């Protein structure tokens, strides 16, 4: 419960530093390094000047209040009673409003008393960078937002492109992300922008790569501190598209996406789930590898990011040490074990197919030491993965 010591997982900044090959001492165990802040360690604490412990006589008089007269005292009591009556009416109205609110299905249980659920944010209270006081509200909002922004099955409406072309493009974009050393968030947002645009616009075969690099340009501007320039994308496409072409496509994609790139990402939900499960670096990295495999596969585009994140962590935990999907994980992920098993099975089939797949960018990427060579572990060819794959 609250008293249980919990391993605090890496923050977004530390995780990205680790992915870029920049070491952070003891990232996942014991003490963690401080997180990056834009304006150093600034707090709202105001330090008052000390007067050597002495208070001047004239200052004491300034703090004294005059005794109220009977007339003013009666007026104060009357005002207080009126305020209390108004506040009581507001409280009753708030309770009535709360009773009328329908909770979403995936919100599960909102209290910790019904199940053995740990409050994973308790230790973060008082740390302004972790937003522990309203982190639960943030994730409830993200759950609603992902349902509104998830792309539909758009490929049947496309006349010149198909599943294979999309997979080739995404596989190449993953290589570009590694080449430019971009954040993981940038990669996921790139694919979401790509799919959202294709969901609304028919694209010619000759312009598909243009749409892909423009999506990465937009995602870089949204996520990166120092985004690549348009000229970098002209170079990476071997001058297939001019700067002007990319600018024109950028305007077109901005309008199609309604200037809204606030997509909740799989990574956001995975970090929350990993904290709830108190998982180590190996399980967390394996879950990231499994999630990234789904980017290439068109079948997963209609899945909610939260569902993909939950399924990836569940499969990772089963592959490494057969860990249980605890009530705490059910509560914070929003998914029971039975709810995610169909997605886990599809993910298992996809993982087993990687040996014969033409799309090796993710597998090669996670074979590097900074990703713990996770794509080479023997569990990815073991009987546990086959058992889940056979459920389909």
Curated annotation (Swiss-Prot):
It holds the Pfam family Cyclin_N. GO terms for molecular function: cyclin-dependent protein serine/threonine kinase regulator activity. InterPro entries: Cyclin, Cyclin-like_dom, Cyclin-like_sf, Cyclin_A/B-like, Cyclin_C-dom, Cyclin_N, Cyclins_cyclin-box. SMART domains: CYCLIN (SM00385), Cyclin_C (SM01332). CDD domains: CYCLIN_CCNB1-like_rpt1 (cd20507), CYCLIN_CCNB1-like_rpt2 (cd20509). The keyword Cell cycle applies. The keyword Cell division applies. Keywords: Cell cycle, Cell division, Cyclin, Mitosis. One of its GO terms (biological process) is cell division. Essential for the control of the cell cycle at the G2/M (mitosis) transition. Interacts with the CDC2 protein kinase to form MPF. G2/M cyclins accumulate steadily during G2 and are abruptly destroyed at mitosis. Belongs to the cyclin family. Cyclin AB subfamily. This is G2/mitotic-specific cyclin-B. It comes from Hydra viridissima. The lineage of its organism: Eukaryota, Metazoa, Cnidaria, Hydrozoa, Hydroidolina.
